[in-house]
């Protein structure tokens, strides 16, 4: 026994020395463990630097890899993913995980290929500004009873979903060679009562049980909805339902798109919160502000300068590191598009979110700044085990500076996170920082914070064998252990940096660049000081260390592409590249370093591989002219796209057809669904009978068309109330004549109007009231009175002047819950006649009876038109050119406009509400090389008519790319088939 114990301890010591650690596990797997410091995967501590990504909001699976490569290149090692029940289940008992973007196996495969772990978040409720919070729309009509509780009716609905999606998640766990390391239970569910029999506790236990049935063994997690409660932590009132890893969501910015001086107030109480409520677990922020959503009538994301500023990640994300957070997920990192009718009413078509990666997949400065943090955390292993040594304003010579002081108890490495105490200030402050090192107390001079700037100052920072920084006032971006140890610093131009190598004599060095290095002696070693010049400076030291000094702009274009596919990248498993817009990947083969990437403009490219046998650079498969520097790097030129002229076709050949024939009294609606219910499963009682809630008749997303009949000439009008979400308008006609309606309001989900009937238009019998309603989504759970169950459609309709309606019929999207277009899915289309007939689909042949009219002509009264055109693109094969459609309308226009590209509804334009008028299309929805079908539906909300004054294709940026955008997207664009049965 003693021999066994000795051998066990010896082995443990060896494993610990190799960086392998043990920790708490969940009793199901030891592949993912944790302690109060960090998560560990396969025995290796990991700083989880994750980005939120929603595959549903980018319906081209091949582009998921494009996004993942960009995240990996910019320092991320994980993605957090919602799986929306609504996207996969058009009707009860039916689940689609195969067609198009519904094939989530490809999501896991691409994540693994890109080198990213996955945090799975399947709900069943998600929120996420998506329609009904991600609940299947067929169930969001009251039939689930008390949602998000242990109600049996609810349980019976969500259980099949979690079982089905859970099996796929389970197949892709780290234990099975997949990328999934955490599985979230529910979403922001506040634990209101600590009682083992409480319905929420029972509900969370049910979720855990069903995930276990599905085969999930990785640790569970949950995300607290801000500091509003303490929920599901094993360290606080654990009466059941607790998860393994507690997390806290936080959106602290308080920023304004219209006032650049608002907000920017840091939260400095995260550490105390986690110490109080999850002290045996690592500090986890499952959702930390990567931007913020904008409502109908709000601002457009491109105008939100404060949200887009790189100052935000620099200050806020470093503050989180100072708070000892080691699981950090940014919501959103790529937002995407609320295409079709997938949005909740709180947002419009774009879900750009002012995220680091633009909706068009373009890299913002915000992402470039985020990369500096991601690459730092990737190599800074001592950061993964620290305690809070202290914090406050007493660490510097200036009390306006706030400091977090973290210490690794094993290595004595220190991390001092600095920011202005008043985080919103724009003051420039120079000060001295007092630090504790292995050489004693040291005062580091001439540290500057330029307004909304933060810095992480390291002490006793190891960056390779026999290589340690005693301290550095320049920030460390990353380091590499190659043939020599390579250290990369960054500062703003003009800022001063000072560093000391631990236990090193005065070193000789050679400088290459604009930043001049000087030395001075001290009791703790030679100090090396410099003022950051513009661009890149390399310094070769006599101890072999190579140091790069980068200004911020150069750091933004600095990459460390891994040479491993693992999300965990050791310092000897990446090379260093400076210059291009994006470096997707790199490898060394037969004396050549092969790099794939993207460039907007031609740039220099410098590569350090640490391999003296490497003589050439291949950029996107082509060898470029290369020279070798005195310090061992290779330099060449990476071509860009600045000389490429993008000529987009004008859209001047349109055909138009009536998309509201139902207005006419003689329209045949005999095959429509009869509205004859006198009771509803919905707990909200209708204002009149019969029930006219669209969900009760199997129509959920998109436009609805109602036709109600009544008799008599004495009726003077009708009182109608419609509820289809914020900003949703509606219009009504009696026997073909416009009778009124509502243009909708961003502040109202339901609107009422008293319709006025012209007596001359009425008949003794069989008058027809046609009501056409727009739709902006189902509410999320937090919206009163009943959240996702708040009904859609007509809440009430009564005649004025005597009598009742004799009948009602409804028509919605073609097929209702049948999901006749499984590739695009159940939320793409609504019930406009042109949609039901498939006029928006590729291959539809416009009849000769269609008029030659464009959206610029519009309609003169309360009418609707469906406009179609085709155009061809022939972009170069190696180009990524995001393309969108710019719309405009005369002031005062009140209309509902939809944009369809190759069958996908990728634009919902309300010119009277705004703010969005520019709608981008990703490749795969638009064909960059080939024919495209563009359709625009437009119906006027008043008898003043409606038209557009701008309809033109626009290009965003243009990039020479190593990614294959020249693919056959045909499988994503199923064509037209006869739909006459849905008239």
Curated annotation (Swiss-Prot):
Q: Name one GO cellular component term.
A: vacuole
What is the catalytic activity of this protein? Hydrolysis of terminal non-reducing beta-D-galactose residues in beta-D-galactosides
- Enumerate the residues binding substrate: 82, 127-129, 187, 251, 353
Q: Where in the cell is it found?
A: Secreted
What intrachain disulfides are recorded? 257-304
Gene Ontology biological process terms, A to Z: galactose catabolic process; polysaccharide catabolic process
Coiled-coil region? none
Q: Per UniProt, which keywords does this protein have?
A: Carbohydrate metabolism, Disulfide bond, Glycoprotein, Glycosidase, Hydrolase, Polysaccharide degradation, Secreted, Signal
Q: Which InterPro entries match?
A: Betagal_dom2 (IPR018954), Betagal_dom2_sf (IPR037110), BetaGal_dom3 (IPR025972), BetaGal_dom3_sf (IPR036833), BetaGal_jelly_roll_dom (IPR025300), Galactose-bd-like_sf (IPR008979), Gly_Hdrlase_35_cat (IPR031330), Glycoside_Hdrlase_35 (IPR001944)
Q: Where is the active site?
A: 188, 287
**Keyword Amino-acid biosynthesis attributed:** no
Root EC class: hydrolase
Q: Which domain of life is it from?
A: Eukaryota
The reply on keyword Signal is: yes
Return the similarity comment: Belongs to the glycosyl hydrolase 35 family.
**Name recorded for this polypeptide:** Probable beta-galactosidase C
Organism in which the protein naturally occurs? Aspergillus fumigatus (strain ATCC MYA-4609 / CBS 101355 / FGSC A1100 / Af293)
